[in-house]
């Protein structure tokens, strides 16, 4: 993808993708695969397209002086199997609305099937009515995506698995566990203990421990405010004189992570590795992690990470091969579950 002018300047136009036709795609009931990348996911979208051996679908995106978004397809998608890749980073609501306009545009051009690929699904913490007079934004977002015209969805490592039930359309709730755990396993870290950041993540942390053949420790913590603030209380398990792999699904402001790391250090842990799927890294999260003395930070590109937030000890694994293979299998009508059993 090549952006001619910055997408944040009202009154400007950018060209997305390439117009040459795809070749070599497997046939399906929905025609050929077309990958359309939102502006926020240009790098990931290009990687997925390259994995599939196809150019990105071409469209023109204009932001008018009143900040209205206008999208025009530069090629016909009639009857085709279209995959809209959109990362939900800042500006979040602009990116959500861009995705919705894209879906509507594809629907009105008679696309055969419209698949939304949202590597990081926003509002995942708003999955239940746990306080008086609050909404359930995750359910609302699922309803909007369906109503606009999406036929299928894909996402990675949902914060709450029950969000799958908010969608009435078929979808694939994927995991980056195999990608990240395979990377860690190849490192052959000696004297390793896997540690969960909290009780809620303990089940997934156990999967890590079983795959790596290590002991499991769990940090018990108590929330002191909203989800961006927490306090680590105690350690379940022994990490003294052990290398520790701290596992979580996402890092927002880094508060929970810093508390967990400090507790591990106070309990006598040696080198600490920190692995998580979604690197949101809001506010000063990067500075907090940089000051913690971590051996290595391992994450993925489900959430675009700018260069100024990529620390020297940070390894970013691409989810493009995972998403690309799932897209191929969905297009060909093959099992996605088999991918994780191979």
Which stretches of residues belong to each language-model region?
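PRPP-associated nucleotide enzymes
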Residues: 1-342
């Amino acid at each position: 993808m090549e952006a001619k002018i910055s997408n944040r300047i009202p009154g400007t136009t950018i060209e997305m993708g390439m117009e040459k036709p795809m070749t070599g795609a497997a046939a399906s009931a929905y025609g050929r695969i077309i990958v359309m990348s939102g502006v926020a996911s240009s790098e990931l979208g290009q990687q997925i397209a390259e994995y599939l051996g196809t150019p990105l679908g071409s469209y023109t995106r204009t932001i008018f002086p009143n900040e209205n978004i206008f999208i025009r397809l530069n090629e016909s998608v009639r009857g085709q199997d279209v995959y809209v890749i959109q990362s939900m980073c800042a500006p979040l609501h602009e990116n959500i609305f861009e995705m919705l306009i894209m879906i509507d545009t594809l629907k009105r051009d008679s696309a055969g099937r419209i698949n939304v690929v949202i590597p990081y699904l926003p509002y995942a913490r708003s999955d239940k009515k746990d306080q008086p007079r609050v909404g359930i934004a995750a359910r609302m977002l699922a309803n909007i995506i369906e109503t606009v015209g999406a036929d299928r969805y894909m996402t990675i490592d949902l914060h709450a698995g029950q969000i799958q039930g908010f969608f009435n359309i078929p979808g694939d709730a994927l995991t980056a566990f195999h990608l990240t755990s395979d990377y860690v396993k190849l490192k052959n870290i000696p004297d390793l203990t896997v540690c969960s950041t909290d009780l809620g993540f303990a089940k997934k942390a156990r999967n890590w421990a079983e795959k790596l053949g290590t002991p499991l420790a769990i940090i018990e913590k108590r929330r002191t405010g909203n989800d961006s603030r927490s306090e680590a209380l105690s350690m379940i398990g022994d990490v003294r004189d052990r290398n520790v792999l701290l596992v979580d699904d996402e890092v927002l402001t880094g508060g929970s992570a810093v508390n967990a790391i400090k507790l591990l250090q106070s309990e006598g842990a040696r080198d600490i590795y920190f692995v998580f799927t979604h690197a949101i890294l809001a506010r000063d999260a990067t500075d907090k992690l940089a000051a913690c003395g971590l051996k290595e930070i391992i994450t993925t590109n489900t959430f675009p990470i700018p260069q100024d937030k990529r620390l020297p000890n940070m390894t970013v694994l691409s989810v493009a091969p995972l998403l690309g293979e799932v897209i191929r299998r969905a297009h060909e009508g093959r099992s996605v579950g088999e991918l994780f059993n191979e």
